[in-house]
């Protein structure tokens, strides 16, 4: 019999699983769910193994099958992204970013990036990884009317400040950034362009968002668990020469990682194959659903930002909830109703610590089979809460609503016999 405390821990996990998988509308823009098949492949002995180094050049023995997995994953990502070099060893998008910064900037160098209030990720700024590497930053200018980087002002800034590295991509990311235009300006001062594709990686793989490497970026980094619905992890893909790629490779190991969380490789491969087969349909539906949610919110009196631009071209929707008490209050009230969003700073906020907005992403609910009609229902739930209805009453309706959306779509269907076959192959005790 298990100790009582382990039963208590199991109960916590069980209750979490039931709550987030079956009872909530999950609109966190940085999350997703793996397919049942990918989850099966995620459970394996590699969770406890090391493989320092690179394929064919390891510092540990016992890695012959790790090499097969890593090599296969690198080759498939390289083909899909049309990249000269891919590294799948970073354990997160942030680690991928840090390794790239370290490899491509001199000591005390300068990075041009978007601040948090314009959507920049913390790893792009002095509150995060840039500061840890003692790099200087200059802020890319923002065009509020177009909710995007101000191209003309960015050209001027690049010419004047001559940054070593320019970071595009964002944490709040509604519209594709002007990669081509910025890359042309970067070329005049010898700067590298990195596009952080963490949020839109699945949309890129699905073919509904521009591939930054084909737009002129030297590097794209990503995480493998947002719109790309795999296990948590990171990836770097480049259009650089061998020398620069080797610098990035050495920055990943030994500088920023020692263990690569090898058990994720097989599940990531499964997800990539699923995206090859189902990705265009899935990614297209994500963008359609995001637009539908935004339009429905507007009709409910909860207008998202960027109305004149069509609200969004990604999985995300951002709403200024100042008149409903601000981002903190709105997100907390919605959680009471089992609608999970996050507070988020908007460009006009005086302090990112007091955000006026909330950010939503539709990628997870899309994977559970929801479409435009369901987005309209979700908008009604959100509006009911923000207009002051008791969240407990809305929660009852949300739980009932979710009962019809428990099966993960856009993946391979496997029957019970196939599940048992895969599980028995991976189960360490058989």
Swiss-Prot record:
Pathway: Amino-acid biosynthesis; glycine biosynthesis; glycine from L-serine: step 1/1. Its cofactor is pyridoxal 5'-phosphate. Disulfide bonds: none annotated. Signal peptide: none annotated. CDD domains: SHMT (cd00378). GO terms for molecular function: glycine hydroxymethyltransferase activity; pyridoxal phosphate binding. GO terms for cellular component: cytoplasm. Keywords: Amino-acid biosynthesis, Cytoplasm, One-carbon metabolism, Pyridoxal phosphate, Transferase. One of its GO terms (biological process) is glycine biosynthetic process from serine. It holds the Pfam family SHMT. Its main location: cytoplasm. Its EC number is 2.1.2.-. It is an enzyme of class 2 (transferase). The modification N6-(pyridoxal phosphate)lysine is found at residue 226. It is found in: Cytoplasm. The record marks 225 as: Plays an important role in substrate specificity. (6S)-5,6,7,8-tetrahydrofolate binds at residues 120-122. InterPro entries: PyrdxlP-dep_Trfase, PyrdxlP-dep_Trfase_major, PyrdxlP-dep_Trfase_small, Ser_HO-MeTrfase, Ser_HO-MeTrfase-like, Ser_HO-MeTrfase_PLP_BS, SHMT-like_dom. Catalyzes the reversible interconversion of serine and glycine with a modified folate serving as the one-carbon carrier. Also exhibits a pteridine-independent aldolase activity toward beta-hydroxyamino acids, producing glycine and aldehydes, via a retro-aldol mechanism. Belongs to the SHMT family. Homodimer. This is Serine hydroxymethyltransferase. The lineage of its organism: Archaea, Thermoproteota, Thermoprotei, Thermoproteales, Thermoproteaceae.
